[in-house]
Structure formats: structure tokens, C-alpha cells
Amino acid sequence: MEDVMKVKVEEDGIPTAVLPMEGLHDVGPPPFLSKTYEMVEDSSTDQVISWSTTRNSFIVWDSHKFSTTLLPRFFKHSNFSSFIRQLNTYGFRKVDPDRWEFANEGFLGGQKHLLKTIKRRRNVGQSMNQQGSGACIEIGYYGMEEELERLKRDKNVLMTEIVKLRQQQQSTRNQIIAMGEKIETQERKQVQMMSFLAKIFSNPTFLQQYLDKQVHRKDKQRIEVGQKRRLTMTPSVTGSDQPMNYSSSLQESEAELASIEMLFSAAMDNESSSNVRPDSVVTANGTDMEPVADDIWEELLSEDLISGDRAAEEVVVVEQPEFDVEVEDLVVKTPEWGEELQDLVDQLGFL
């Protein structure tokens, strides 16, 4: 293409020097800026990319559609991050952190001639380091920090819930174990009690000796209580005699308990001569019955002592013949009580 020349003709008809047209050799804006300006100016693409209300910046409304439709048509690629990097090299800055809005002093709506003022920056990496992260455009990481924070919060909440559920599981497991132990203990006590009753009523001699000892012990306790009350009411009794009576009564009670325990242990040793089967004496878990029998024996003795003390308080004003009548009644009613328990033992299969 030949250069267009202007020829100035003077009045005398002699041409002067030829001058080139103004702006003929000026360099136009870079193709990237021109194509970007055309995309923003095109009203048919306003749903994807358009000017802001002030027309001093442009907004990418739909980055996905922008990458799949407009970038391939204008730039022969679909890499949105590459487009952002190109904007960064030409000095564009991100205006709104919540959306893809960019601005440049030379990129204004209706003023395309200002594109020539936009220059490509050199040493972009060095200038970015000097300006800091605030002046840089986010490239593919928009909203990532907020998303990471949200995920961290969700993780902490889930971890807290897991810890609570594990604590509840452990507590429930401990309760189940404790309940199982209680059930086993109750079952074991029932079996031991029935075995003990079967052993007692399989030996009538032991039962009779036990009743005789109980009657004798109650008799002594009532007499001692009556003596103590009479001694406290008598003024001639000195204070030194009372501790001796207490100590003697305690010694007699200890001797009484020792003799009863010896009698009970002797009866337990005669297990082979009784009519009870061997498996009825052993508990469900195969342990010996002597410790269990001792515990039951102590409970029976404590109940008898409590009932004996109450009876002794009532007997202070009662004459001796009435006491004999109570003993006879006790001896007479014993066979009936034994028959009822014997029937119970027979039904349970211990004899």
C-alpha cells in the first residue's frame, strides 16, 4: 500500500515538500485490549460480561459461560485464569472482592481511543512483590479462603459431636456392665440362699441345736437386762460393780457366739452324711458354700439379736412363767415352720 502524500501547492504553481498524514504511523492498542473492549461493548453479551453502571470498569457475571463461549471465540482458548493473568500484566485491578470486576484508568466505556495509553508492564513478578498481595488480582483462588474457614469450622463441629458420642457410648457400656454384674450377684445370692436352707433342713439335729441355743441366749439376755435395771434402781450398789457386770456379760456373749459358730461349722463339715446332693451345696459358679453360709449366719444372728433386745425390754415387767410359755410356743411351732420350708426345698429340687 502506497503512502498517501499531501502536496501543498503554492500560488505560483510550484509544489513544496510532501508531508505524511497525521497519526499515520502511530501504533494501535494491543489486540488483547481491543478484543476485550469489543466483548464488553457488545450488548448481546451483557448477561456474561458488561460495563458497570459508571462505565469505568467491566464485570464478568458468569465466569463459566465466559470461559466456554466468549474466550474461544475471541482468544482461541478457554482458560479463564490465563485471561486474568493478561489483565494483570496490563495493570488492571480487581475492584470488588465479591465478584469479577476489573478496572483500568484507560479502559472506559465509549472511549476506545484511551486504550493506547494502557501499556504492558515489564517484570510483572517483581512489581507484584513490591506492591504486595493487595494490588494483585486473584487468579483462580477467589473465595477459597472463606471456603477453607467454613470447612475448618464444620470439621471442629463434627469432631466435637464425635467426642460426645464416644463419651455417651462409653457411659452406656459401663452402665450395661454394672447392670450385668448386679444381675449375676442377685442370681448367685438366690442360689446360695436356697443351698444354705437345703443344708440346714437336711440336718434336723443342727436345726434343733440352733433353736436351743437361741432360746438359751435370749433367756440369758433377758435376765441380764433385768439385773442391770435393778442395779441402776438400787442406791446401795456402787459404781465399781456395774462395769464388771457389763464386762462379764460381754464375755459371755462372745463365748456364746463362738460356741454357735463352732456348732455351725461342725454341721457344715458333716455334709457327706446328709441327704443333700453334692451339687446342691455348691453354688452356680463352683465356689465353696462356707463363706456364703457364714455371711447368712451372721445376718440371722443379727436379726435374732435385734429381736432379742426388743423382747428383753418388754420382759422386764413380765414374770418368769410367761417367758416359759413363749419358749414352749416357739418349740411347738417349729415343726410346722420346718415342714413349710421342707416343702419349698422339695419343690426347688435341692433335696
Swiss-Prot record:
GO biological process assignments:
cellular response to heat; regulation of transcription by RNA polymerase II
Alphabetized InterPro entries for the sequence? HSF_DNA-bd, WH-like_DNA-bd_sf, WH_DNA-bd_sf
Any Gene Ontology CC annotation: nucleus
DNA-binding interval(s) = 29-123
In terms of SMART domains, this protein maps to: HSF
A GO MF term: DNA-binding transcription factor activity
Q: Which residues form a coiled coil?
A: none
PROSITE patterns documented for this protein: HSF_DOMAIN
Keywords for this protein = Activator, DNA-binding, Nucleus, Phosphoprotein, Stress response, Transcription, Transcription regulation
- Pfam families, alphabetized: HSF_DNA-bind (PF00447)
Q: Where in the cell is it found?
A: Nucleus
Instruction: Give the main localization category.
Output: nucleus
- How does the record describe the protein's post-translational processing? Exhibits temperature-dependent phosphorylation.
Q: Which family does it belong to?
A: Belongs to the HSF family.
Q: Tell me, in a sentence or two, what this protein's role is.
A: DNA-binding protein that specifically binds heat shock promoter elements (HSE) and activates transcription.
Could you give the subunit structure recorded for this chain?
Answer: Homotrimer.
Q: What is this protein called?
A: Heat shock factor protein HSF30
Q: Which organism is it from?
A: Solanum peruvianum (Peruvian tomato)
Taxonomically, what lineage is the organism? Answer: Eukaryota, Viridiplantae, Streptophyta, Embryophyta, Tracheophyta
Query: Gene that codes for this?
Result: HSF30
